[in-house]
Curated annotation (Swiss-Prot):
<feature type="binding site">
    <location>
        <position position="349"/>
    </location>
    <ligand>
        <name>Mn(2+) 1</name>
    </ligand>
</feature>
<dbReference type="InterPro" id="IPR023042">
    <property type="entry name" value="Peptidase_M17_leu_NH2_pept"/>
</dbReference>
<feature type="active site">
    <location>
        <position position="353"/>
    </location>
</feature>
<dbReference type="InterPro" id="IPR043472">
    <property type="entry name" value="Macro_dom-like"/>
</dbReference>
<dbReference type="GO" id="GO:0070006">
    <property type="term" value="F:metalloaminopeptidase activity"/>
</dbReference>
<dbReference type="GO" id="GO:0006508">
    <property type="term" value="P:proteolysis"/>
</dbReference>
<feature type="binding site">
    <location>
        <position position="267"/>
    </location>
    <ligand>
        <name>Mn(2+) 2</name>
    </ligand>
</feature>
<dbReference type="InterPro" id="IPR000819">
    <property type="entry name" value="Peptidase_M17_C"/>
</dbReference>
<keyword id="KW-0464">Manganese</keyword>
<dbReference type="InterPro" id="IPR008283">
    <property type="entry name" value="Peptidase_M17_N"/>
</dbReference>
<keyword id="KW-0645">Protease</keyword>
<keyword id="KW-0479">Metal-binding</keyword>
<dbReference type="Pfam" id="PF00883">
    <property type="entry name" value="Peptidase_M17"/>
</dbReference>
<dbReference type="Pfam" id="PF02789">
    <property type="entry name" value="Peptidase_M17_N"/>
</dbReference>
<comment type="function">
    <text>Presumably involved in the processing and regular turnover of intracellular proteins. Catalyzes the removal of unsubstituted N-terminal amino acids from various peptides.</text>
</comment>
<keyword id="KW-0963">Cytoplasm</keyword>
<dbReference type="GO" id="GO:0030145">
    <property type="term" value="F:manganese ion binding"/>
</dbReference>
Length: 499
């Protein structure tokens, strides 16, 4: 499906459907008024019949409107003009797709005027991403994938010609971000017998082939891990026949404007049984999503390469599988991490932090200025923040504020939680430097405190996405979060200006 930006006369557009907005009390938008005048009041006369009130959720399809070349006009209710926000705007766009996608409509022109939720850049970007999200379908493995829509192209009409350049920039960014989000979802949704640590390494290597001028990939296998002393990482994978692989993706942009080295680390547990501290059976199938952090890093690197961002970005996919076996690590074991610090294992289901701690230490060789790890780390974060908000932890206030700003811009909600010294005491151990879990309270915080012990040499932030990375139930699947937030963070680091 293709997107286009242009400024056009709506009555002259030969298309299958034009979409325009209508507000409560049957108030027409400027685009709807234009079409109404061109059709000698035809739209107004139909609205007076009472078939659309202009409330959010209302839609009315008009056919063969006089003096209009489009085959159809879709009127979309937008509620009260002064009460439209980002959430309502997304719902409005979803309603348009619901009204269109099952019909034989191939080409659409959107002309949304009088909706002032943001400047033209954000308006266009939100439209494209929301429409793309509404049309996304999880790839099935049963060879019966059916095309869910007939839509071939969507044109966004820009009322003011002076806005065309900014609108085209917004479209370019939106399509790159959507590519990142879709790639993240598709990877996350794969079953664990397909997507294992080796498969993650293959996906990383594909990037070096597709973006060969900007991306170099190094794969750290178990032999190399042993040489590096990554004993915590190795221990987690010992119970599985699928050996761990850590994929290191190095992106170097052209004409770099920001000399900082930015690194992302993604937890890539392609399946987490919990190990000997085994998980309950009921929802264990969802533990294929325990690699959503790695998938998010993978997607974010795609966006950087697509837009040729003038940055240096490193992405680590920490691929591993936590299974029960005769070689599994045990509660009571003491592991020496790559950093030299020792960890007493009290629970083998607190494994993500063990994979991440060695990955974070490995990153030191690149002397990064900023490191952000992304992980479906703790159920405690879901208990604290629910399924709408991700947890944020950081050892640097400026970095934390930058991520919070990107969160506000993208409406991908995160909330900052503390790393006070009192919480570190929860990890005390009698026989090691510290244990891998606390005593049951503030689990999301103590997990972040654990990670912070391996991040002393750079500015670091941790995003716990355990509640936001996927949805359960009837429409289950990966959400693609927090990819847009991470992409926006990189765009901001690139000094892009939005007018």
């Amino acid at each position: 499906m293709n997107f286009f930006i242009k400024s056009c006369f709506l009555d002259k557009e030969k298309t299958d459907c034009i979409v325009v907005s209508v507000f409560e009390l049957s108030e027409l938008s400027d685009s709807a008024i234009y079409l109404d005048k061109c059709s000698n009041g035809h739209i107004t006369s139909l609205i007076k019949l009472g078939d659309i009130q202009g409330k959010i959720g209302d839609t009315l399809m008009l056919y063969k409107v006089p003096k209009i070349l489009s085959k159809r006009i879709l009127l979309v209710g937008c509620g009260k003009k002064d009460e439209i926000n980002i959430i309502r705007f997304k719902k409005i766009l979803k309603n348009t797709i619901h009204a269109i996608k099952k019909k034989s409509i191939k080409n659409i022109v959107y002309s949304f005027s009088n909706i002032n939720i943001d400047n033209i850049y954000w308006m266009i970007r939100r439209m494209v991403l929301s429409l793309k999200e509404s049309l996304y379908e999880t790839i099935k493995i049963n060879n019966t994938n059916i095309k869910n829509t007939n839509i071939h192209s969507i044109t966004l009409n820009i009322i003011k010609k002076n806005d065309l350049f900014i609108a085209k920039t917004a479209l370019k960014h939106a399509l790159a971000i959507d590519h990142a989000i879709t790639s993240t979802k598709n990877l996350s949704n794969l079953p664990p017998n397909i997507c294992n640590p080796l498969y993650l390494s293959y996906k990383a290597q594909e990037l070096s082939k597709k973006y060969e001028n900007n991306i170099v990939v190094e794969i750290i296998d178990i032999k190399k891990m042993k040489e590096l002393g990554m004993n915590a990482y190795i221990a987690v994978g010992n119970g599985s026949k699928n050996k761990p692989f850590m994929s290191v993706i190095k992106y170097s942009g052209n004409n770099i404007v920001n000399k900082k080295i930015i690194a992302f680390v993604g937890k890539g547990l392609t399946f987490d049984s919990g190990g000997i501290s085994i998980k309950p059976a009921l929802h264990m199938h969802e533990m294929k999503y325990d690699m959503c952090g790695a998938a998010a890093v993978y997607g974010t690197l795609i966006m950087a390469a697509e837009l040729q961002l003038p940055l240096t970005v490193i992405g680590i996919l920490s691929g591993c599988e936590n299974m029960v076996g005769s070689h599994s690590f045990r509660p009571g074991d003491v592991l020496t991490t790559m950093s030299g610090q020792t960890v007493e294992i009290l629970n083998t289901d607190a494994e993500g932090r063990l994979v991440l701690c060695d990955s974070l230490t490995y990153l030191e060789r690149f002397s990064p200025d900023i490191v952000i790890d992304v992980a479906t780390l703790t159920g405690a974060c879901v208990t604290a923040l629910g399924e709408s908000v991700s947890g944020l932890f950081s050892n640097n206030e400026e970095l934390s504020n930058q991520l919070l700003h990107a969160s506000q811009e993208t409406d991908d909600k995160i909330w900052s939680l503390p790393l006070f010294s009192e919480y570190h005491k929860e990890l005390n151990s009698d026989i090691a430097d510290f244990s891998n879990i606390g005593r049951g309270k503030a689990g999301a915080i103590t997990a972040a405190c654990f990670l912070s012990k391996f991040t002393k040499k750079y500015n670091w932030a941790h995003l716990d996405i355990a509640g936001t990375a996927w949805k359960s139930g009837k429409k289950s699947g990966a959400t693609g979060r927090p990819v847009e937030l991470l992409c926006q963070f990189l765009l901001n680091q690139s000094n892009y200006i939005y007018n």
